[in-house]
UniProtKB/Swiss-Prot annotation:
One of its GO terms (molecular function) is ATP-dependent peptidase activity. Fourteen ClpP subunits assemble into 2 heptameric rings which stack back to back to give a disk-like structure with a central cavity, resembling the structure of eukaryotic proteasomes. This is ATP-dependent Clp protease proteolytic subunit 1. It comes from the Bacteria. It comes from Borreliella burgdorferi (strain ATCC 35210 / DSM 4680 / CIP 102532 / B31). The active site is at 99 (nucleophile), 124. Cleaves peptides in various proteins in a process that requires ATP hydrolysis. Has a chymotrypsin-like activity. Plays a major role in the degradation of misfolded proteins. Pfam families: CLP_protease (PF00574). It is found in: Cytoplasm. One of its GO terms (cellular component) is cytoplasm. Its main location: cytoplasm.
Amino acid sequence: MHNLIPTVIENTGNYERVFDIYSRLLRERIIFLSGEINDPKADTVIAQLLFLESEDSSKDIYLYLNSPGGSITAGLAIYDTMQYIKPDVRTICIGQAASMGAFLLAGGAKGKRESLTYSRIMIHQPWGGISGQASDINIQANEILRLKKLIIDIMSNQIGVDKEKLALDMERDYFMTSSDALKYGLIDSILVRE
């Protein structure tokens, strides 16, 4: 199956320029993060965030999310960059923001975390496949517990939900509609056509 990226032709008087759709949207300060969050995708998103900050640190950046989640370390790298740069990062869920996708959605600037009407959001505890010697399994289990606490601490601070409640809700897959996510504090508004 081919993954075709649409192009846009921009006509500016004397010449035409052809852009892939993502490059054209980047000019409007829009970044798309779709699919599994992994190191290569994180590198691309981080580079785009840093580029847009260097272009104009006073204008918001729009991060559209449609992700089932993915790597904790890749997600934390994106989150850290979102918090580090000067522009506010508006997060918008389109489709779904699950696991690390929900974490990044909640990591947007307060008051600027949004979702489309029929998107779904899901939070849960970190998980990982562990194998090896008993001592290695113990080391990995301790690291997963450390990351779980870190994610809960950060999300609790971002969305204003008590750490104990958040930890309990994250014990299993916790699915939310946009309305549920709004009540929960994961998002600040639901986008509808005006």
